[in-house]
Amino acid sequence: MNFLRPHLRALVPAALRRRVRDGLESVRWRFPAPPRALPQYGLTTTQVYPQGTNFDLVMERALAGKLEGLRLSARTPVASIGTCFAEEFAQFMQAGGMNYVRTEPDALASSASWGRVYTIPNLLQIVRYSLEPDFPLVLERSAGGYFDPLRDHAPLPSASEAEARDAVRRHREASRKAFAECEIAVITVGQNEAWIDRTSGMVWGRMPPKEVLEPRRASFEVREFSLSENRAALEQALDALKRANPALRFLLTVSPVPSFASFSDSDVVSRSFANKCLLRALVDEAVAARSGHAFYFPSFEMVLCYNPTSFRADNRHVKYGSVDRIFGLLERTTGLARPRSSG
């Protein structure tokens, strides 16, 4: 048969051959061989990249050992805080009737009324105002009334400044209680761009509303946090929580949800994933430095690495269709585009 192959290749157009190859890879992806080890190198099945639908099976085997020290059961008091993907965890815990800590109502099912916590510096602010009685209480005023700018999806604005201050104090006590009552804190990091009040130095929980931003635009800046800024903020947040609750264990995750928009770059897709890589590296450092009480759950990898549309059956190499898309974009955005014949 081998002698026929060159003749068949000459008869079948290259584009068709590539499509057929991608189709065969999709079939192979659905019916992989069992997970393999490489004993000659001392590697187990969880150390060799999983092929096809073996992905979840191999991940399960790997995590069974890594998460053993977490000691998480349906009865373990758990709190969660973080980006929109943290909502999914909260809803999963509550739907299953598990011991999910909630110390006050929250529109997004969080353990306290934190809303979505997008950045690590914003997380640190929440930890600090929960544990430090003298942390500044900052209020802003919009058309609806007074509100807490440090939180996303905070309750409705209060009619008076006094009411708003009382509401923030109650929230901060509920926040402190949530961190104190849990045995495991699930922290999901996900974004790296925030609005900063230049006057107070506070990181806002979300973009300032139009009626606040427009007359004071010079008072605000959009900041993308550096590796060192994020590292320092994450270390301070985890260390402060551990001092306040010495038995506390951490389950850290990185949200797979990209940025909705970027004020820091004209290319939101590339900027978003550059920030994801930065956050993923920081979480890896934090877990390694806190062996025995900090653990990582790979929700980020489970979403982005499980991609039979783009990957071949080995879940590593890229299908021809995706290769064509990649280099088609390179041609269209550079001077590499092939000149078309005028005829």
Name every feature range the model reports, one short phrase each.
Residues N2-G343:
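Extracellular glycan-modifying ectodomains
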